[in-house]
């Protein structure tokens, strides 16, 4: 997969290219990340990339020419079929369904804004889609771009150590992940659930699904509103709710 980065701070992406899952993907040749800085496409001795906005107001905007030329250079390197994405608070909010959708593209170019943003005409002429990672303000598009890269890279075959990992991630099926445990078996009086030690794979699968449904109901109930639960899922969720109510009643009685 090819991902081009257009950013005033390309060195920030070493966190992606040099470390962790994405770093290994780059080393294996599964992920090709290249970057272009608009400063390299300026024509003045100060390497100016920003200017005042028409109509006044605070802050500066990224200028058209250096940014557009950097995008064109990234497009030329990517070849035909590259999708150009601008990381923006006005964009579609990134979720697991969106990540899965973006992962079907073999070529992405991510444009990272700075200052107060970019000239609207760049968005109109060069950008295919705008994406946001949430309803809050950041200093630039680099961190959202890294978030997008990390999440999308997990779908590239061979990137994860276990092919089921991406399938079983939180949100992969619209639910939060279940609790996980490793050694020791007992930690300060807290025991690993016995079912996980049983070796009964059918019961383990059932327990994990129940916990996933229950955790989603407790922490992100709005996610369940968009799901058509299977008969098994509905039954397991009902069991979880009953067990949770019993635990709450027991806890209240001890308080």
Curated annotation (Swiss-Prot):
InterPro entries: Alpha/beta_knot_MTases, tRNA_m1G_MeTrfase_C_sf, tRNA_m1G_MeTrfase_TrmD, tRNA_m1G_MTases_N, tRNA_MeTrfase_TRMD/TRM10. One of its GO terms (biological process) is tRNA N1-guanine methylation. One of its GO terms (cellular component) is cytosol. S-adenosyl-L-methionine binds at residues 113, 133-138. The keyword Heme does not apply. Pfam families: tRNA_m1G_MT (PF01746). SUPFAM superfamilies: alpha/beta knot. It is an enzyme of class 2 (transferase). It comes from the Bacteria. It catalyses: guanosine(37) in tRNA + S-adenosyl-L-methionine = N(1)-methylguanosine(37) in tRNA + S-adenosyl-L-homocysteine + H(+). It is found in: Cytoplasm. Keywords: Cytoplasm, Methyltransferase, S-adenosyl-L-methionine, Transferase, tRNA processing. The keyword tRNA processing applies. Its EC number is 2.1.1.228. One of its GO terms (molecular function) is tRNA (guanine(37)-N1)-methyltransferase activity. Its main location: cytoplasm. Specifically methylates guanosine-37 in various tRNAs. Belongs to the RNA methyltransferase TrmD family. Homodimer. This is tRNA (guanine-N(1)-)-methyltransferase. It comes from Salmonella heidelberg (strain SL476).
């Amino acid at each position: 997969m090819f991902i081009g980065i257009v950013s005033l701070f390309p060195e920030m992406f070493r966190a992606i290219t040099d470390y962790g899952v994405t770093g290994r993907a780059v080393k294996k040749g599964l992920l090709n990340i290249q970057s272009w800085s608009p400063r390299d496409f300026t024509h003045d001795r100060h390497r100016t990339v920003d200017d005042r906005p028409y109509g006044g107001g605070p802050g500066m905007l990224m200028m058209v020419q250096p940014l557009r030329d950097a995008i064109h250079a990234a497009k030329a390197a990517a070849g035909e079929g590259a999708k150009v994405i601008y990381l923006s608070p006005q964009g579609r909010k990134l979720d697991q369904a969106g990540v899965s959708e973006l992962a079907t593209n073999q070529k992405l170019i991510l444009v990272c804004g700075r200052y107060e943003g970019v000239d609207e005409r760049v968005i109109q002429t060069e950008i295919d889609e705008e994406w946001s990672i949430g309803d809050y303000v950041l200093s630039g598009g680099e961190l959202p771009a890294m978030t997008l890269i990390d999440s999308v890279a997990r779908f590239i075959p061979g990137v994860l150590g276990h092919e089921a990992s991406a399938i079983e991630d939180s949100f992969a099926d619209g639910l939060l992940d279940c609790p996980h445990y490793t050694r020791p078996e007992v930690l300060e009086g807290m025991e690993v659930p016995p079912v996980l030690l049983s070796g009964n794979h059918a019961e383990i699968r059932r327990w994990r699904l129940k916990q996933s449904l229950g955790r989603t109901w407790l922490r992100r109930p709005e996610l369940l509103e968009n799901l058509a639960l299977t008969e098994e899922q509905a039954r397991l969720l009902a069991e979880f709710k009953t067990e949770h109510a019993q635990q709450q009643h027991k806890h209240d009685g001890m308080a």
